[in-house]
Amino acid sequence: MASNQKVIYVYESFRSTTPNFLGTLFVENVRGRESYSFEYDADWLKSSANYMYLDPDLQMYAGRQYPTGAKNVFGLFTDSSPDRWGRLLMTRRERILAEQEGRKPRKLLDSDFLLGVYDETRMGAIRFKLDKDGPFLSDDSKTPTPPWTSLRTLEEASRQFENDESGLEQKWIDQLIKPGSSLGGARPKATVLDTSGNLWIAKFPSKHDDVNVGAWEKVTHDLARLCGLDVPESMLIDFSKYGSTFLVRRFDRNGAARIHFASAMTMLGKTDGASAADGSSYLELVSFIKANGAAPKRDLTELWKRIVFNMAVSNTDDHMRNHGFILKADGWHLSPLYDVNPVPEGDELSLCVNEDDATISLDLALEIAPYCEISTKDATAMAADILKTVRDNWNRLAAECGLSRSAQEYMRPAFSLALE
């Protein structure tokens, strides 16, 4: 039986700007199928005796540990890996290299995708090496993170890349692979650096868009801010006739310091695709915050208001990957809101609100308010304020984002709860 092992050295940069050796990730490859195990570094465990766990499948003790259930890879490392867009870029790059070298394309495995993300823009604060004395991976000191001034070029590259059916135009891959491989989701995107040294995510128009997705995400983002929700800084720029580019400042960085981010999928021990269909619920997020949150009262209120807001704008893509937590010195905090978009035909959320119902219904949200330690009186007032804010501002914000009256009428059903 053909087998070989890859040893990956794992570091964290969330306790200081100096990387700390976290442990060793072992990847066993048997006939093209990988299996994973991880072992914490003994010194890291000693220095982190009272630290919060990083993954429910990785308990704070010495010795090899293995993923449980249907998972093949620990969620801690899934969060550091690219999603569909980044994987597509890496797969296309491998096809190009194979053609240049006159060989068959190599099938990329999970560890290839994990190590193929550029360290400089990798999400969160987990980092990887194949040699303890070598660079963090992936490394490319010759090509820095693209500056703000390259946004127009990057948008054009993403469009050409999507329209290149052969997938073998290297110049588009070269421009997109570094800034885009670190990010999740399926849409074209890239990380760029502003003049103050801050990282931003740029989400570009896609050829598959039926509406101006970037403009509508900016509308909902600004509505969330008006509703008092925790959202990062954002802006909207038009570079072409194909749609708007939505930019949002990354919340996993504070200057040069990295902030550890974990998706709710990871911290709740879920697998990709977990949804209302299998009973995944907001109540599980509530339980996690109560058990592990550093500021449970604040985060429970914030989470409940987000549920109401998601209903008010019909954000039906609120799955476990689109909720997350950031790790600070005092423990886990609910991350800022991200990836919120209106859906005109949406009538159910991705997650159950209570134990078994995902319907967009204010009554359901009010039903679980006590679990979030919010009185019925306060919840009713908060919900009324959110709905009024959405009702009074969505048209105005849409117009400010350049959306036509017909575009607004098309999207009107998404705001039906607020308009009732």
Where is each model-derived feature located?
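Phosphate/dinucleotide-binding and metal-coordinating scaffold of catalytic cores
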Residues: 1-320, 324-420
